[in-house]
Each structure stands twice: as structure tokens, then as C-alpha cells.
């Protein structure tokens, strides 16, 4: 059972459907079932309430077990899962949502996302239509997308008249997604960043380490703080309890404008995850 008073208070943001979502959460991509259970329990213990999983991760059941072990009431949690590309389609997406709910042991998810637009598959608009149905039936409180470009985002909005609540995209100092953030904002869509820690590639960067030293923070904390100060929601992945606790401890300082600018100058367009224009996996 978790302590009654969590150690970290995480702010929330209001989505375009009036639901609220924590600004910072734990992702469990590429974690084994055992790693997932331990990571989720560690995160919940220190005050995290947003857990981000996906059908493609193969660990929804592990998330369910960790949540059950925590003793935290379902209503206090924000659980995200994602539609796998092979399940895209109007009816298939609804069936996939129900299958995810079965694995999660839940009646609803707080946020259901299309994992990838997968343009070569040509089903993301139909999949979005199915997700609208799932929301209408109460199986998903909010619905959104991942890895959508402006073209993909405009297509589903124009064809269904329903705007995603969230667009979760790869976003870090090497790929600051300035144009996509502006596009999301124009559509009143929250930008949620993933891979914010750059897979560890900037931890020895002299700009980052100098800024971290100035604030008495870790490079990871500075990376997360930079992302939050851009106005993004963020999910990060970690399997280590001490890193999870440290990474949620980012709400007691603010980066100065010159430090934000220095971080912004690291942008070079490096993409660490697949190109959403061509990728047909996950």
C-alpha cells in the first residue's frame, strides 16, 4: 500500500475536452514486465499519477498488477495506452481498446492514443473514427494521437470534426519540434513529449552539465524542466527507482531565459525514433 500523502505534487493541465492530465508522467516503453511493475510502483509511491503504456509494449498487464498492488484508487490515476498499428481501422480500433482494457483490468482509460499514423497502412482516419466511438461508449475519457505531423492532424480533424486532446511526439533539445508545437497549439492540442532524456546522449554535453551544476540539479532534471517550460506535458522512461524519484523532482526551480536559449541552440534535427512520415510499425 502506498503512503496516504505522496512526496511529490505534480501540476495538471486541462485538455480541450475539459478533462485534466498530469503534466509529467512515467512511460514504460521497452521495459520488461518485472521492470514495469517495479518502475510503476516506485513512481506511484513518490506521487506520480500518470502512467503511459501501449498495446505494442506488451506490458499493460504488468501496469495493472502494479496499480493493484499500490492500493491507489483508480479515480486518482491517469492511465494512457495506445492503439497498435495492426489494429488500425474503424471496428478494429474499438476491439483493440476493449482488449487493452481487459489487459489493464479497467473499465476505461483516461487517454487512448493512435500510436503511429503509419501513412503506408492508410487506416489512421478510420482508426480515429473508431476511437471517437470508444470515447462515446465511455471506454476512453480522452482520445489523442502520437507522432502526427500537421498533415496527419489536419486530415483527421477535417474529416471527423473531432480534435485530438493530445499529440505525443518525440521532443528534446536535439529535436525541439518548434513548428509542430505551434501547429498543435493552433488546433488547441496539448503537446506531450516523449524521449525527453535523449536516450542519455546529452548527459555529458558541456552546455547541459554546466546549467545543471548552476542549479544543483542533474542533467536529466534540467532536460525535463526545459521541456516543461516550453509548455509541454512530458512522459519519461526509467526503470530505476532513484532516477524516477529524481526525475519527478523538477517543480522547485525554473530555468532562466538565457539557459532556455542555450538549450534551444542544441537543436540540430536529430531524430532518435522512427520518421512518422514513413514508419508503419508499432
Swiss-Prot record:
Its EC number is 1.1.1.-. Keywords: NADP, Oxidoreductase. It holds the Pfam family Aldo_ket_red. NADPH binds at residues 197, 235, 237-239, 246-247, 273. The active site is at 57 (proton donor). It comes from the Bacteria. Coiled coil: none annotated. InterPro entries: AKR, Aldo/ket_reductase_CS, NADP_OxRdtase_dom, NADP_OxRdtase_dom_sf. Belongs to the aldo/keto reductase family. This is Aldo-keto reductase ML1669. The lineage of its organism: Bacteria, Bacillati, Actinomycetota, Actinomycetes, Mycobacteriales.
Amino acid at each position: 500500500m502506498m503512503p496516504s500523502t505522496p512526496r511529490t505534487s505534480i501540476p495538471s493541465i486541462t485538455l480541450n475536452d475539459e478533462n485534466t492530465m498530469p503534466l509529467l508522467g512515467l512511460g514504460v516503453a521497452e521495459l520488461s514486465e518485472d521492470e514495469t511493475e517495479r518502475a510503476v510502483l516506485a513512481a506511484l509511491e513518490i506521487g506520480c499519477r500518470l502512467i503511459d503504456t501501449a498495446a505494442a509494449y506488451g506490458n499493460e498487464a504488468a501496469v495493472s498488477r502494479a496499480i493493484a498492488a499500490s492500493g491507489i484508487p483508480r479515480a486518482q490515476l491517469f492511465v494512457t495506452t495506445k492503439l497498435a498499428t495492426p489494429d488500425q481501422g474503424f471496428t478494429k480500433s474499438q476491439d483493440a481498446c476493449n482488449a487493452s482494457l481487459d489487459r489493464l483490468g479497467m473499465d476505461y482509460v483516461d487517454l487512448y492514443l493512435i500510436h503511429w499514423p503509419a501513412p503506408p497502412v492508410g487506416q489512421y482516419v478510420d482508426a480515429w473514427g473508431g476511437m471517437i466511438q470508444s470515447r462515446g461508449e465511455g471506454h476512453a475519457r480522452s482520445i489523442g494521437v502520437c507522432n502526427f505531423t500537421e498533415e496527419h492532424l489536419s486530415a483527421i480533424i477535417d474529416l471527423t470534426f473531432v480534435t485530438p486532446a493530445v499529440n505525443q511526439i518525440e521532443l528534446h533539445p536535439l529535436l525541439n519540434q518548434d513548428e509542430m508545437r505551434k501547429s498543435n497549439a493552433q488546433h488547441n492540442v496539448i503537446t506531450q513529449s516523449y524521449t525527453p532524456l535523449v536516450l542519455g546522449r546529452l548527459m555529458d554535453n558541456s552546455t547541459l552539465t554546466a546549467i545543471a551544476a548552476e542549479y544543483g540539479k542533474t542533467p536529466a532534471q534540467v532536460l525535463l524542466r526545459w521541456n516543461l517550460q516550453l509548455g509541454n506535458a512530458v512522459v519519461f522512461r526509467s526503470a530505476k527507482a532513484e532516477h524516477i524519484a529524481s526525475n519527478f523532482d523538477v517543480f522547485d526551480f525554473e530555468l532562466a531565459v538565457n539557459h532556455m536559449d542555450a538549450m534551444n541552440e542544441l537543436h540540430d534535427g536529430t531524430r532518435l525514433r522512427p520518421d512518422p512520415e514513413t514508419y508503419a510499425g508499432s
